[in-house]
Amino acid sequence: MTAQTTLEQRRFNMIEQQIRTWDVLDPQVLELLWQVRREEFVPPQHQALAFVDMEIPLRGQHEEAIRLGQIMLNPKVEARVLQDVLPRPHEKVLEVGAGSGYMAALLAARAQRVITLEIEPDLVRMARENLQKAAVRNVEVREADGAQGLAAEGPFDVIVLSGSVAEVPPALLEQLKVGGRLAAIVGEDPVMRGTLITRTGDATYTTTQRWDTVAPRLLHFPEPSRFRF
């Protein structure tokens, strides 16, 4: 068995054993997971973890990476988010939390254009290099704090928050087009929900929460007040 065969077998196992069993069944999503090579976005020192059911640290030790939100999300979480918002070929997408660039690459394989924001300079460089090597040309990686989105480039058809938040800031919702979708992981450890918000009118939105998970925080998003008595 060649190294390439082993790699493809591991990818197959990830899709069949982790992702399909988590109700990710859209054939377009499953095809993207075959096409976009996850291992090309994983740090060299963690290549053995590319298809493992876990978060992968992008910088430093695992605990520190979790605290700073500098990770690749679990593969099944990435796939579920992608299925929830699946962009159309004419759509413009905003991602907050570029990380290694993998989610942006998945989104870009469907969308017309993706802008992804990353606050950590080292990860900005990593994402840009990974996307360039993968020949993904319709993604722009910007070094920026994404907690308030990117109103100057809006409105967007799709917004993806690649990490967890206590709540979705109104400023981000206002940057959705009518008919646009926002995906986020919302809540507090140990109870977080995969959340899909659709803008249905100028001031109306629908929210569905379809699945449970836990993910590291995105930096600088508001946290709920904690009163002590």
Model-derived features: positions:
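Class I SAM-dependent transferase core
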Residues: M1-L94, R110, L123-K133, G201-L218, ...
